[in-house]
A protein has these predicted regions:
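Divalent metal-binding acidic/histidine catalytic loops
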Residues: 1-152
Length: 152
């Protein structure tokens, strides 16, 4: 069962990176137990696979027709957030951001800080800085392809 566990988690890593960002947290938690998974971890991984099976037809639709875009924010916009000391093992904070283009997510990130922040404000500042760096990248991208979208 350990070999099955490892190969299944490895396969899910591919899905997370390319098609299923909604599995990122679950897969990252399972990666922590790759060397010695217990029955609890195997049962949990089977629940993830059932979730994957039941949500196989769920996806993102990128439709830029005028009829659908009337009810959707246009251009590039993003959000960020941080959770101060939310990891009970390390007391590290989680930072996250997501950027949308024409209503569809095009870039996202969620990760534990590499260091311990001293306050909620510090955690939020770090998340804002990370999101601003990503917004700058998108600005350069749109400038390079000859169009201009403002990040909101």
């Amino acid at each position: 069962e350990q070999r099955w566990y490892r190969s299944t988690v490895a396969s899910l890593i591919y899905f997370v990176g390319w098609t299923r960002p909604d599995l990122a947290l679950a897969v990252s938690q399972h990666c922590k137990f790759m060397h010695n998974p217990g029955q609890v971890h195997i049962a949990s991984l089977k629940r993830v696979l059932r979730y994957l099976k039941h949500t196989a037809n769920v996806g993102l639709k990128y439709d830029f027709s005028p009829a659908t875009s009337a009810s959707v924010k246009t251009g590039l916009y993003g959000y960020y957030d941080a959770a101060h000391a939310d990891c009970p093992d390390s007391m590290k904070s989680t930072l996250a951001y997501v950027f949308f283009f024409e209503g569809c997510p095009v870039s996202w990130h969620s990760k534990l800080h590499t260091y311990i922040t001293t306050s909620t404000n510090h955690s939020e500042y770090c998340a804002a800085a990370k999101a601003a760096k990503e917004a700058k990248w998108w600005e350069k991208f749109f400038t390079e392809i000859g169009t201009r979208y403002f990040c909101r």
